[in-house]
Curated annotation (Swiss-Prot):
Residues 136-223 form the Ig-like C2-type domain. Disulfide bonds join C41-C114, C157-C207. This is V-set and immunoglobulin domain-containing protein 1. The lineage of its organism: Eukaryota, Metazoa, Chordata, Craniata, Vertebrata. The keyword Transmembrane helix applies. Expressed in thymocytes. The keyword Lipid metabolism does not apply. InterPro entries: Ig-like_dom, Ig-like_dom_sf, Ig-like_fold, Ig_sub, Ig_sub2, Ig_V-set, VSIG1.
């Protein structure tokens, strides 16, 4: 048993002797947004031949959950990753792989890895958890529920930026003064629950998002007929617009159907194999044909009074 333990320890020491030793001075770093961050990393080589020396810094970003190269060095040449271009300064002295990153932003929060490789030795690495502290951004205030008397509603507040994570508080604004709200409030989620809305609860409300770097606020106007009235007006306006469009389409369809239902034009053959267009309605005889028709019989009557005076009678003549 002791013999096997001796062999195991011997193999472990042999492996360590052929591995680059990397030391991290500060494994946890907090830095304020906009400031510079220095990531200390030193190493010890067992093989003093540095022709195959490779130093690489990577980050696993907390926000995007992506891995990206921060800095790379090999054969006297160095380069920075796309997000860190012109932001990285490397020490590059013997045994020192320390880098300084300028103008830290919230997306720079993550786990940084310092890896040193010097073939034929195995690579060694160390990790740093870096957090960029950011004051809260201006929060977004919103209302959930119908803003009408007797309805159950809640107020919501959320900041997209902020590290440490902001806490939220709601207050009612009266004559420029902040009044506490007796309703249910969740400081972590930024929600304020108001049961059945009454006239007493109407007014202006302010949400404050804060952490140890600062605070930011937003306000909203809570009154019946406020946002609910705007939404109702928008819905009514949309319905009216839809009704107008439907009426126009219906009118055009009816007009098109009426045009299609008009009686077709008929053709009547006349002398000389010529055709003339006449309406499908009852036709009147052409005026020029009236003169060609036979004259009607005319009966003439003489004055009966004159004939009677003369004692004569006269038969009607054709």
């Amino acid at each position: 048993m002791s013999f096997l333990l001796f062999i195991t320890l011997g193999l472990s020491l042999t492996a360590l002797s052929h591995c680059v030793q990397v030391t991290i001075q500060n494994p946890i770093i907090n830095v304020t947004s906009g400031q510079n961050a220095t990531l200390y990393c030193t190493y010890i080589l067992n093989n003093q031949n540095k022709n195959n020396l490779v130093i690489q810094w990577n980050i696993f970003q907390a926000k995007s959950q992506n891995q990206e190269t921060v800095f790379f060095y090999q054969n006297g040449q160095s380069l920075s990753g796309p997000s860190y271009k012109n932001r990285v300064t490397a020490a590059m002295s013997p045994g020192n792989a320390t880098i300084t990153i300028s103008n830290m932003q919230s997306q720079d929060t993550g786990i940084y890895t310092c890896e040193v490789l010097n073939l034929p030795e195995s690579s060694g690495q160390g990790k740093i958890l870096l957090t960029v502290l950011v004051p809260p951004s201006v929060p977004h205030c919103s209302i959930r529920g119908a803003v009408e008397t007797g309805h159950f509603i809640s107020l919501l507040c959320y900041s997209e930026e902020g590290m440490p994570r902001p806490i939220y508080s709601w207050n009612r604004v009266e004559n420029g003064l902040l009044k506490s709200t007796p309703s249910q409030m969740n400081q972590q989620k930024g929600s304020l629950i108001i049961g059945n809305l009454t006239d007493f609860e109407e007014g202006y409300y302010r949400c404050t998002a804060s952490n140890n770097l600062g605070n930011a606020t937003c306000e909203l106007n809570l009154h019946t007929g406020g946002e609910g009235g705007v939404i109702a007006a928008a819905v009514i306006g949309g319905l009216l617009a839809a009704a107008i469009i439907i009426a126009i389409v219906w009118f055009l369809v009816v007009k098109r159907k009426q045009k299609k239902q008009l009686p077709p034009t008929k053709e009547m053959k006349t002398g000389g194999n010529q055709y003339m267009a006449v309406s499908g309605e009852a036709n009147e005889p052409p005026k020029e044909n009236l003169g060609a028709s036979e004259p009607t019989e005319t009966i003439q009557f003489h004055d009966h009074a004159e004939n009677a005076a003369n004692g004569e009678t006269e038969e009607p003549t054709a």
